[in-house]
C-alpha cells in the first residue's frame, strides 16, 4: 500500500495551521488513492500526557498513523542538521510515495534536503489534485507546482515518475476534523549517527 508522510509542525503545544492543512490534504488524497497517511512529529522533550494530547489532535486532523520522536536534539526550530537524520530514517523505513511539508520555515529548511537525500523530486509551492479516471486510466494523483526551481509552473503525475516526491504545500483552510483521535502511534528513537 502506498504511504504519504506529512511532517507536522507543532507550535505552542498544538498543530500549526499550515500543518493541519497539509494533513487534511494528505487525508483527502489518501482516501481517493487507498494510501496510508503517516503524521511525523519531531518534538523536543515532551511529557507522555503532552504526546497523547498531540496524538489525539493529529489523528482528528487526518492521520492514520503517527510517528513521534521526542528528543533533546529536536528541540528548537526545524533544521536539517537536527531533523534530517530522523527524516532520512523514516524515508528509508517507509519508502513513501509522497512526503508533504507545510508551507513555511519547516518546508523550506527540510524539504529540499530530504528530497536530495532520498533522490526524490522536490516540488515547492505546490497543491495536490486528483485527476479523474477516464476510459484508459484510473484516477491518479498530481502535484501542481506553482514555481519550481526554474520558476516554472508544472503538473507532475505521480504515476509518470519513478521516484518519490517531496512537496511543500501552499497553506489553505483545513476542515476542523477528518479522522479519529485514536490513531495508531509509534514512538521512534532519535537516529544515532552512522560511523
PLM feature spans:
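N-terminal glycine-rich FAD/FM-binding segment characteristic of electron-transfer flavoproteins
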Residues: 1-195
Amino acid at each position: 500500500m502506498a504511504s504519504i508522510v506529512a511532517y507536522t509542525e507543532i507550535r505552542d503545544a498544538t498543530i500549526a495551521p499550515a500543518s493541519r492543512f497539509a494533513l487534511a490534504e494528505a487525508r483527502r488524497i489518501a482516501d481517493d488513492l487507498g494510501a496510508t497517511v503517516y503524521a511525523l512529529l519531531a518534538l523536543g522533550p515532551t511529557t507522555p500526557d503532552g504526546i497523547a494530547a498531540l496524538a489525539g489532535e493529529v489523528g482528528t486532523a487526518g492521520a492514520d498513523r503517527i510517528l513521534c520522536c521526542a528528543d533533546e536534539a529536536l528541540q528548537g526550530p526545524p533544521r536539517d542538521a537536527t531533523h534530517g537524520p530522523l527524516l532520512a530514517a523514516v524515508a528509508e523505513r517507509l519508502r513513501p510515495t509522497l512526503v508533504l511539508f507545510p508551507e513555511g520555515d519547516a518546508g523550506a529548511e527540510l524539504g529540499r534536503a530530504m528530497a536530495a537525500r532520498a533522490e526524490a523530486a522536490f516540488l515547492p509551492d505546490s497543491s495536490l489534485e486528483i485527476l479523474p479516471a477516464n476510459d484508459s486510466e484510473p484516477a491518479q494523483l498530481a502535484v501542481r507546482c506553482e514555481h519550481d526551481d526554474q520558476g516554472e509552473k508544472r503538473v507532475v503525475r505521480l504515476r509518470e515518475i519513478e521516484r518519490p516526491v517531496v512537496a511543500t504545500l501552499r497553506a489553505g483552510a483545513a476542515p476542523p476534523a477528518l479522522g479519529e483521535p485514536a490513531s495508531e502511534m509509534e514512538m521512534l528513537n532519535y537516529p544515532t549517527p552512522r560511523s
